[in-house]
Amino acid sequence: AKIPGEEMEKKILEAAQELFLEKGYMATSTVDIAKKVGCNQALVHYYFRTKQNLFKQIYLQYVNSLMQLGRQNIQQCASVTELVQEIIHLYFTFFTKYPKVPYFFVNELIVSSEHRQMVKECFIDNQMRIMLFNQLTQLIRNDIQAGKIREINPYALLQNMVSLVLSSFLALP
């Protein structure tokens, strides 16, 4: 039975995601992906052109999922304390839902300069992330001026929070 185009594209994406999470990007070939789907390699290339495009689309799905998960709750935070709690909760919720993703993110950042550039384009330059970071920065300024917290670099605070949460998941067996 012939599978419709959109469904085939989805199956290829799901197979690639599963294999990338299981084996990593470098150890996964488009042949592996095609075998898992039950199609030929040409079909994988037809829909995505390159393995890198597949990787980018999967990475973007995770970034967008993470951003959407926190969008409403984070925007409602009125203080740095509330925002810190919400960001930590957001990452714990996300990584609990997708337990292999921390390894995937970290491994690909370490292994590939190409992927580091892609992360910059997909995550660092993400408009939702920029908006949330600006909100964090404004809340920090407000709380510093009100004498509630000491002077702190917003980027350092965010990096420390995410690193601590991420390390909790990377330490799991």
List PLM regions with ranges.
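N-terminal intrinsically disordered/low-complexity leader segments
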Residues: 1-7, 14
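Short, basic, alpha-helical segments at the C-terminal edge of helix-turn-helix-like DNA-binding modules
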Residues: 60-65
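Short secondary-structure transition hinges
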Residues: 92-135, 156
